Regions:
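Conserved helicase/translocase motor-coupling segment
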Residues: 1-62
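C-terminal accessory regions
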Residues: 49-51, 55-58, 62-180
Length: 180
């Protein structure tokens, strides 16, 4: 899936070079220049802008993307430059909040747009082969989308209007709250 695609794309788009620092943690190589995504909210991490030093704040949020600008092995830290121009420093122990984002799932892409998208359908579980997933994937692209799959897969998705039921317990919580 996306994990394996990220490994392949990292080697193609950001291959090892003598001038790029890198390190391994949890069977993953992190390299200067790698595309990364914040995968959970961190309300406390400090950020700043180099072009406007007095502008600083706290908080990097789920779905924000950027690239590894510097790796500081002795300090066991990395500096990330986010796409909006903010810099944040992460200790190696905080890297569970980040993952590579050369390839991401449709779910993680929601709320984002990209100039170009490639939608790979091979190996997609049947429960995710729905019209709304296909629509969401296609509408992430601003300029061009390429769908890699068979006509049958695309037709199945386009015709499959089944909705995945979600059992959140929200109705029960609201009813309990109303009874209180």
């Amino acid at each position: 899936g996306a994990l394996h695609m990220n490994e392949l794309l990292q080697e193609t788009l950001n291959p090892p070079e003598s001038y790029k620092r890198e390190f391994f943690i949890n069977n993953t190589v992190y390299r200067e220049g790698d595309r990364i995504m914040q995968i959970k909210n961190n309300y406390k991490i400090k950020w700043h802008r180099n072009d406007c030093p007095e502008e600083e704040g706290e908080g990097i949020f789920n779905g924000e993307m950027g690239e590894i600008a510097q790796i500081h092995e002795k300090a066991r830290e990395i500096t990330v430059l986010f796409d909006d121009g903010r810099f944040a420093v992460y200790s190696f122990s905080e890297l569970g909040q980040l993952e590579h984002c050369y390839a991401i799932t449709v779910h993680k892409s929601q709320g984002s747009e990209f100039p170009y998208c490639v939608i790979a359908l091979a190996g997609t579980p049947s429960m995710l082969m729905t019209r709304n997933i296909l629509y969401t994937a296609i509408t992430r692209a601003r300029k061009m989308v390429v769908i890699v799959g068979t006509r049958e897969q695309i037709q199945f998705m386009a015709e499959n209007d089944r909705q995945q039921l979600r059992f959140t317990g929200l109705k029960r919580m609201l009813e309990n709250d109303a009874d209180s």
